[in-house]
C-alpha cells in the first residue's frame, strides 16, 4: 500500500481517497466560520422591518444554515458524516456599511473536525439571505467567508488573526 501524500485526501499516485479516522480517539471539536453579506441601505431597512416579499430573512437563513451543517457529508465528497451535537448561526445587522455579519458554529465529539460543516452552514445562510433579498436587489455581495476558530483533534486550537 502506498504512503499518503501531503494532502490527506490524496494517495501518492494522485487518486482521491476518504481519510480513515477509525483509529482516532473521539475528542470534543468546535469550528466557527464568519461571513458578511453586503446589501443596500434600502434592502437592509426592508430586512430589519421584515418587509421583504419572501418573509423573515434571518430566521429562514438560520434554519437553512443549521440544516446544511447536518447534510455536509452529502455535498462534500470526502467529508465524513458526523453526529453534530450543536449547530447555530448568529447574525449582526450593521447599518454602516449596510450588511449582515454572520457566524456559524458547529460542535461534535468525534474523530474528525467540523470545519466543513461550519463553512457549509455559513455559506448556505449567506446564500439564503441573497435568495430572499434578490427580488429587491441584484448586486448583493457575499464576502470574507472564513474559518475564524477551530478546536479539538491532533492539530489543536486555531484562531484567525
Swiss-Prot record:
One of its GO terms (biological process) is Mo-molybdopterin cofactor biosynthetic process. Pathway: Cofactor biosynthesis; molybdopterin biosynthesis. It is an enzyme of class 4 (lyase). InterPro entries: MoaC, MoaC_bact/euk, MoaC_sf, MoCo_biosynth_MoaA/MoaC, Mopterin_CF_biosynth-C_dom. GO terms for molecular function: cyclic pyranopterin monophosphate synthase activity. CDD domains: MoaC_PE. Substrate binds at residues 78-80, 116-117. Disulfide bonds: none annotated. Keywords: Lyase, Molybdenum cofactor biosynthesis. It catalyses: (8S)-3',8-cyclo-7,8-dihydroguanosine 5'-triphosphate = cyclic pyranopterin phosphate + diphosphate. Its EC number is 4.6.1.17. The active site is at 131. Homohexamer; trimer of dimers. PANTHER family: MOLYBDOPTERIN COFACTOR SYNTHESIS PROTEIN A (PTHR22960). Belongs to the MoaC family. Catalyzes the conversion of (8S)-3',8-cyclo-7,8-dihydroguanosine 5'-triphosphate to cyclic pyranopterin monophosphate (cPMP). This is Cyclic pyranopterin monophosphate synthase. It comes from Nitratidesulfovibrio vulgaris (strain ATCC 29579 / DSM 644 / CCUG 34227 / NCIMB 8303 / VKM B-1760 / Hildenborough) (Desulfovibrio vulgaris). The lineage of its organism: Bacteria, Pseudomonadati, Thermodesulfobacteriota, Desulfovibrionia, Desulfovibrionales. The gene is moaC.
